[in-house]
Design a protein with these regions (language model features):
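Short, small-residue-biased leader/transition segments that mark boundaries at the very start
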Residues: 3-10
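Active-site-flanking segments in enzyme catalytic domains
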Residues: 19-202
């Protein structure tokens, strides 16, 4: 059974000292919802937390809007501290579409273009951290299904980029993403099964 012990020093050193909760949603100029922001490694802000109902836990909603966002923003802090191999940026460098990413629609529409989510198509840094966030918050079956439905070219691009991501996390930070995923999914199950009482969290 995996534990967080190997990562204690890392998390204590780099986890933001402030996690800021905003009850209402935030929006970009293009109308897309902002799920979270990271500010200089010191603060992570999560929006729309008034939608969380501790008496009726929807683990899929928590995963999409909060857990995945936390891993996304924390990954930004890591690469801002120690940058990743710039070869990652060149793999799909001509496919990034900036603020028009939302026009891609559902994530599965991005898979065949070599991206794990539509938002990953906005720019290379977002692409990099989306790989981490999606991998550790979803099951192996989800990941394999994504690769299967990405088609030959999309699958090859995702695998090529993820190899750099996986190596970066392991060699730079000593984080094994498979082990971290086991921990994250176990704790998600604890919440979904009522083994964590969210109503007493202050």
């Amino acid at each position: 059974r995996s534990t967080l012990f190997p990562y204690t020093t890392l998390f204590r050193s780099y986890i933001p000292k402030t996690i800021h909760f905003i009850g209402s949603p935030a929006y970009e100029d293009n109308g897309t919802m902002v799920l979270g922001t990271a500010e200089g490694g010191m603060k992570i802000t999560l929006y729309n937390v008034n939608d969380i109902n501790p008496d009726k836990i929807d683990i899929n909603l928590l995963n999409e809007y909060y857990f995945q966002t936390m891993h996304h923003e924390f990954a930004h802090i890591l690469h801002q501290t120690k940058n990743y191999d710039p070869a990652f940026d060149r793999i799909t460098e001509n496919a990034y579409i900036g603020s028009d990413w939302y026009m891609v629609g559902a994530n599965r529409n991005a898979w065949q273009q070599g991206f794990v989510t539509s938002y990953a198509m906005s720019e290379s840094r977002e692409d990099f951290v989306e790989n981490i966030a999606v991998y550790v918050t979803n099951t192996e079956d989800y990941w394999n299904n994504m690769l299967q439905n990405a088609g030959e070219s999309g699958r090859a691009l995702i695998k090529q980029k993820f190899e750099i991501v996986y190596s970066y996390m392991e060699q730079t930070w000593g984080i094994n993403l498979d082990e971290l995923r086991d921990i994250v999914l176990r704790r998600q199950d604890d919440i979904a099964n009522g083994n964590v009482d969210l109503s007493i969290i202050e």
